[in-house]
């Protein structure tokens, strides 16, 4: 839907539309992560305090909104982890631990993000492929960054990609069990286990 031009109380139509989009994404995260609430456009609009007319201003449908939520979470995970690694110094082990620690810290700060991106997205048929694509992307990034930190091992690029996928897939299952409460572990224990696994795969 096109955004009408015009300034209201010093805020342009484009800025108001952008603010409404943020409200819808935030509301979708809240509704989608709540196991007691059915994720519908009506529920999301009610949570956001917006009419359905404004929903279609930003999104073509519910699946498009949920995909936007997933994309934002994935981008935040990638950026947060990369920044933490950059701040950890030159030691490979410190970088690995900082990167994984930042990811786990993000889940502690807002567990909804892990639940939505890793757990709940599996239940939405149209988002399963997007979830797979995002995990493959994160696996690729893990392969590139870990090899950069540790140096060449003589393995092929395909072997490194396979190791990255193995790590990310295992990490997804680990986080799922942790968020579901079927795995009892502290954040430090999760970070320790994941760091050992990643370093072991690339050495």
Tell what function each PLM region has.
Residues 1-19, 150-157:
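N-terminal intrinsically disordered/low-complexity leader segments
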Residues 1-7, 105, 140, 144-148, ...:
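C-terminal peripheral helix-coil segments that are non-catalytic and often amphipathic
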Residues 16-28, 44, 69-77:
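Generic hydrophobic, amphipathic alpha-helix propensity
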Residues 23, 31-64, 68:
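Helix-turn-helix
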Residues 81-88, 117-121, 149, 178-182:
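Secondary-structure edge/capping motif, primarily at the C-terminal ends of alpha-helices
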Residues 83-109:
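Hydrophobic alpha-helical connector segments
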Residues 108-128, 143-146, 176:
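Amphipathic alpha-helical segments used for helix-helix packing
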Residues 125-151, 161-173, 196-199:
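Amphipathic alpha-helical packing segments from all-alpha helical-bundle domains
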